[in-house]
């Protein structure tokens, strides 16, 4: 069994990016810059953004965090985003989710300039993903999953891939990326009947449902590759959506939780920020 070590791979990829960013800054005198916006005082949001800010510093990317009070109106937030859209020194914009209930998430996502949409959530980038447009900014977690498969030499062409979970953030975009990579893809969701009949056929199984230890050994094919996107808190520990202890001896390769997909998400955010800077300054 191969352990797909996202933490180690993430470290290697960041080291590669350091060199690329240094060369870019030397040739253009431009420093890529990410601006992250938090609305309210959600502790988890602050933790996520702090880790992103730290990662930016590690690779030579500038970052700025703008924290707005909980009572910020939607129009005030949209006005700020408009200012950042028109600021040539800002290359990437991230609005940390969730937002307070009085702010329409879609209105906010749609207001970000597609070329600065570092999360890849804007409809333009969703469409570009479908069309395999090279200018597409891909969502960070799905992009990280595909990078893991590629870096570990896991063949997608002709493989049967099953994605459990159909969210806009992970399930749908990773299904499209797998399709773009010439896999045959089935996307399962809460209305899928007889889930096991699908998962036991998968050469590549990707799980993102937010249910601890949801995928058990009897649901996985011998020799499959399993990517666990889940992050669940159980009895003071972080566990995935896959019963790792039961599944690991049956599969060819598997990601751990923690230390699997999570670190890759932040690393791909850095790569997307760099891509934004390059595209905006061509």
Swiss-Prot record:
The keyword Signal does not apply. GO terms for molecular function: methenyltetrahydrofolate cyclohydrolase activity; methylenetetrahydrofolate dehydrogenase (NADP+) activity. Its EC number is 1.5.1.5, 3.5.4.9. One of its GO terms (biological process) is tetrahydrofolate interconversion. Pathway: One-carbon metabolism; tetrahydrofolate interconversion. NCBIfam families: PRK10792.1, PRK14180.1, PRK14186.1. This is Bifunctional protein FolD. It comes from Francisella tularensis subsp. mediasiatica (strain FSC147). The lineage of its organism: Bacteria, Pseudomonadati, Pseudomonadota, Gammaproteobacteria, Thiotrichales.
């Amino acid at each position: 069994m191969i352990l797909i070590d996202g933490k180690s791979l993430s470290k290697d990829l960041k080291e590669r990016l350091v060199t690329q960013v240094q060369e870019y800054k030397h040739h253009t005198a431009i420093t890529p810059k990410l601006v992250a916006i938090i609305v309210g005082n959600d502790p988890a949001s602050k933790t996520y953004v702090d880790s992103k800010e730290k990662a930016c510093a590690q690779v030579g990317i500038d970052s700025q965090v703008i924290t707005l009070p909980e009572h910020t109106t939607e129009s005030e937030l949209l006005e700020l985003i408009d200012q950042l859209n028109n600021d040539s020194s800002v290359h990437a914009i991230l609005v940390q989710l969730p937002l307070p209930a009085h702010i329409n998430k879609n209105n906010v996502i749609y207001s970000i300039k597609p070329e600065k949409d570092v999360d890849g959530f804007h409809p333009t980038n969703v469409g570009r993903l479908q069309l395999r447009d090279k200018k597409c900014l891909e969502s960070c977690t799905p992009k990280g999953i595909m990078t893991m498969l590629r870096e570990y030499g896991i063949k997608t062409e002709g493989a049967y891939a099953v994605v459990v979970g159909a969210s806009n953030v992970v399930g749908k975009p990773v299904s499209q990326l797998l399709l773009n990579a010439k896999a045959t893809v089935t996307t399962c969701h809460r209305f899928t009947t007889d889930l096991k009949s699908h998962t036991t056929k998968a050469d590549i199984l990707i799980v993102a449902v937010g249910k601890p230890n949801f995928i058990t050994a009897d649901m996985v094919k011998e020799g499959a590759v399993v990517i666990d996107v889940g992050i669940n808190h159980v009895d003071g520990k972080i566990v995935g959506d896959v019963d790792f202890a039961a599944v690991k001896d049956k599969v060819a390769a598997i990601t751990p939780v923690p230390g699997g997909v999570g670190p890759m998400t932040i690393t791909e955010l850095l790569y997307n920020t760099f891509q934004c800077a390059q595209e905006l300054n061509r």
